[in-house]
Amino acid sequence: MGKNIIAGSISSSIHKSYEIGSQIGNGKFAQVHSGTNKSTGKKSAIKIMKKSIVEESAIIKEIEMMTEINHQNIIKLQEVYETDNEVLLVLELVTGGELFDKIVEREFYTEQDASTLIGTVTKVIQYLHSKDIVHCDLKPENLLYSDNSDQAIIKLCDFGLSQRCGSGSPLRSLVGTLTYMAPEISSCTGYGKPVDLWSIGVISYILLCGFPPFDETTGYVLEFPSPEWDNISDSAKSLIKGLLNNDPSKRFTIDQTLKHPWIAGTTCGKNSIVGTLKTLREFNTLRRTNGGNTTMGHNKQSRSTVFELFPSLTPIKSNDENNNNNNNNNNNNNNNEILDKKSNENENENENDKIKINLELNLNNNVNNNNNNNNNTVILENNNNNLEKISTTKTTTTTSTINDSINKTKIQLMNSLDFENDSSSSETYSSSSPIENGGGGGDKFTSPELSSLSIDLGCASDQLNSDKEKIIEQLKNEKSLLQKELLEIKRQSPVPSPSSSFLNNHLQQQHNNNINNNNNNINNGGSTSINNGNGTIERQFRPIHMSKDSDSGSYENLLLGTSPFVKNHNNNNINNNNNNFCHSRNSSFGYGNSYNSSNGGSGCSSSSDESTGGSFKKDKSKYGVDRICLDLQSEFEKLSLPKETMDKLASVLSNYKQKNQEKSLKVKYEKQKDKYKKLKSQLKKDKSLLK
């Protein structure tokens, strides 16, 4: 990056003009120190950004906007210093804290107080819109008080996600904080200035009742529940209804909002709303507990959060504590990148494998899997991932039962060994490397889990290959030993065993029946089972085909499933009754959320099998991790996302694929190993009883 990327920046050392004080804020991409002008003694906040970390275009855009803006209710950029390695912003220092933090300290709070606040914020947005600037991330965290006095004024900050929007084409970047995000942003239909009015509506709602208007139970259905809204004026409800209209063309404009009687103060209530203060304190505490960082953006790496800028906000150590909490949670569950886990998440571990995708474009790794409206994640759930179930018959002490059990166990063992060979080369797993398969997809797994894209899933490929080879070799040795023991039992058994030809014919018949059943059932997207009269080996095929033509594989479902509102906004594309995908609100961006893929739902497509010479071969190209990654990559390419975002997504997809394949393969081999041990134990038991 060149030396002078900011026009008009000061090249001389900042130490000549400012006394740099202690660090008052810290983030991944910037540090904030207190500063004192040596000439005037005026205190400022000095934000230091490394050129090697923060993207050049983002710095230039934010500085250009802040330089153009001059409003008493917007934090002012005073000076810009630049060195070979750093850009230093001298900002107006505010010490009064966030909007909600200030309000919850009050003992007396009325509708009129809320009306005054909303009126001020609306005028600030009117000023920005007059300059064709859309803030895109209007929320309480970005509304700060200038100081701690009673005369303190509100200041709007953080223009890292702001965009210019004239009368031309609409904006399409996926930016903002989900709790305050307008539906047209999450639906990717294009948006403009009305998104800021929607955010004002959400803030107004919270200011009057203490909690957000939408969650996973309501979607975008606006409600005024009792008793919280019983003492709130109809005029306030009228304003909120106008601001929270799902149709941006029918939503209140800036002028309509400012002219509304409630904003003018003529119809708002004067009585204290103590209940709202109590609820708001709870909401504010919960918001803080979840880290406060719920923003998603097209280029969040190039910006810092409000918590990094001013001393009145979260202490510096909280960033490290949050990171430690995230790391601890990640270690507790390989499939979660979560701040908190469900209390019953470890139950039915062998029946359900839930994988969470945080497709936050800023790739933030703070995700929450609670159902308490505190987070936004995407869950792709595949039930019954255990592909093979083997049930063995119990042996009895009678001689006849022992003999029957031995014969059954022999047949079952041989069948299981055959199936192990079949599965290693068909739809269940492929133990060969991508190179051996001609690059045709590498390792494939039935019902592959889509793990989170929000954390680093990096895993060295050479270590993965080494582990695979060791496990494969170990299984081969165990198989060989089991076969030898089986032959030994045949020779030592005093009971006449089935003739070789009879056994071969019996197994061949079972194998042919298996093929026919598989062909019939798989074509119907169902499960296949083989009943040999002694035990049942059941296989369930649950293909995941993220087709670009499938509703469940659409960009809105894969990328925006975290939105708790998409289910109502796009109900033409998503069938909630069939549980193809269920969206709720969560906090990686704000509140609650889950994506549920029902078994055999319309979101999955099943391919037909090819039958040749009495055997079938699965079309593995439509299954497995590689296919899912390719489908996701295809969907991402349609969005015209920034290059740096696409590069990051590609990297994470690649790392995810390696990690997921390694984990799934190990699980498969462990199951096979346990199965062989059980059969071996059964054979030994039968042998001892026989003696």
Curated annotation (Swiss-Prot):
InterPro entries: Kinase-like_dom_sf (IPR011009), Prot_kinase_dom (IPR000719), Protein_kinase_ATP_BS (IPR017441), Ser/Thr_kinase_AS (IPR008271)
CDD domains assigned: STKc_CAMK
Organism for this UniProt entry: Dictyostelium discoideum (Social amoeba)
Reaction(s) catalysed (UniProt annotation): L-seryl-[protein] + ATP = O-phospho-L-seryl-[protein] + ADP + H(+); L-threonyl-[protein] + ATP = O-phospho-L-threonyl-[protein] + ADP + H(+)
Pfam families on file: Pkinase
Domain Protein kinase: residue ranges: 18-263
Region of interest: Disordered: 314-350, 420-447, 510-536, 600-620
Enzyme active site: D137
GO BP annotations, alphabetical order: signal transduction
Family per similarity comment: Belongs to the protein kinase superfamily. CAMK Ser/Thr protein kinase family.
Keyword Glycosyltransferase: no
Any single GO CC term annotated in Swiss-Prot or TrEMBL for this entry: cytoplasm
Keywords annotated in UniProt: ATP-binding, Coiled coil, Kinase, Nucleotide-binding, Serine/threonine-protein kinase, Transferase
GO molecular function: ATP binding; protein serine kinase activity; protein serine/threonine kinase activity
SUPFAM superfamilies tied to this protein: Protein kinase-like (PK-like) (SSF56112)
Ranges of Basic and acidic residues composition bias in the record: 338-350
Entry EC number(s): 2.7.11.1
Binding-site positions, ATP: I24, G25, N26, G27, K28, F29, A30, Q31, V32, K47
Name assigned to this protein: Probable serine/threonine-protein kinase pXi
Biased amino acid composition, Low complexity: 322-336, 423-433, 512-536, 600-615
Coiled coil: 642-691
